[in-house]
């Protein structure tokens, strides 16, 4: 479930960022390019999440 939610958020946020950048540069918004960027970002986030070490010793305050 976390993979699906992560993909949805990555998809939405990357599309909003691409729309904003395209709007600021006075160029047309391209859905296909934004989708490719979203998939690449999703893969990078998932790879980094698996590579990064988890803190197994949770401190209790």
UniProtKB/Swiss-Prot annotation:
Recorded GO CC terms = plasma membrane
Cross-referenced InterPro entries:
DUF2929
- Bilayer topology annotation: Multi-pass membrane protein
Primary location recorded for the protein, binned into one broad class:
membrane
Which compartments does it reside in? Cell membrane
- The residues forming the signal peptide are none
Q: Which residues cross the membrane?
A: 4-24, 34-54
- UniProt keyword list: Cell membrane, Membrane, Transmembrane, Transmembrane helix
Q: What is this protein called?
A: Uncharacterized membrane protein YjzD
Q: Which organism is it from?
A: Bacillus subtilis (strain 168)
Q: Could you tell me the gene encoding this protein?
A: yjzD
